[in-house]
């Protein structure tokens, strides 16, 4: 979980190994000053943790930081990973991701006390998750006035299980995902209000199924276009 394969030692200093184009350092003219901002941002991040977790993170020092390419939901935002080390050489990777304003702010003002976008994100995660990341926190870059949330870098995901799961078990897996999502929303909202909105008919069920099918069709269409563009580019490169 601590990604030891990403940590290398150079001249006695632990650094993140470049894995371009997915992981790379701030070496260009446009990004050279981000590391200085990152040290300040991570210092502010510690203050967002609960006291007992703050004491734990204090045993780590920021050793290196690098850009990390993540999922499509974060395209166009600042995403990086920080390598923290203890005095005896134990690594900890934290991920810092830019938090943008909620789309709901276009129609309604944010609740009092939630003007910090990173704080808003982690409050939602803590409400929806039965057990959240112990290092989940938030910070900001005061020079650019951008907000971020911070969490541990994870390499254990269940999303890819759908690619290898047996057909007979897929229905049970989908049901488990649905129950988990429903439980999360019930934790973060009013269960009675949600139940009343959904009703007892199959209208919502049909709407969700229709959305899922349309989303799958759009994904296939987008992938076909991406593959065609990639094949065209590869053909031009060979010429």
State the predicted function of each range.
Residues 1-31:
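Internal, well-ordered alpha/beta segment that forms a basic, Gly-enriched binding/recognition surface
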Residues 1, 43-239:
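Conserved ATP-binding subdomain of kinase catalytic cores across diverse folds
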Residues 24-34, 116, 166-167:
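General structural signal for secondary-structure boundaries
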């Amino acid at each position: 979980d601590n990604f030891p394969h990403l940590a290398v030692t150079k001249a006695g200093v632990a650094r993140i190994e470049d894995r371009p184009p997915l992981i790379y350092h701030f070496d260009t003219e446009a990004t050279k000053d981000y590391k200085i901002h990152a040290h300040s941002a991570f210092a502010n991040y510690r203050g967002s943790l609960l006291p007992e977790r703050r004491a734990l993170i204090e045993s780590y020092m920021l050793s290196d930081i690098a850009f990390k390419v993540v999922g499509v939901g974060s395209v166009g935002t600042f995403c990086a990973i920080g390598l923290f080390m203890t005095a005896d050489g134990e690594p900890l990777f934290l991920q810092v991701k830019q938090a943008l304003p909620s789309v709901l702010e276009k129609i309604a003002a944010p609740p009092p006390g939630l003007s910090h976008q990173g704080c808003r994100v982690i409050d939602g995660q803590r409400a929806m998750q039965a057990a959240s990341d112990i290092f989940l926190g938030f910070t900001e870059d005061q020079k650019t006035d951008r907000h971020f949330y911070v969490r541990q870098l994870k390499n254990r995901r269940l999303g890819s299980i759908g690619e290898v799961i047996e057909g007979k078990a897929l229905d049970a897996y989908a049901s488990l995902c649905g129950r988990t999502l429903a439980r999360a929303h019930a934790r973060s909202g009013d269960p009675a209000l949600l139940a009343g909105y959904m009703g007892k008919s199959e209208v919502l069920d049909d709407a969700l199924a229709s959305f899922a099918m349309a989303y799958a069709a759009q994904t296939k269409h987008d992938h076909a276009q991406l593959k065609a563009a990639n094949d065209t580019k590869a053909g031009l490169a060979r010429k």
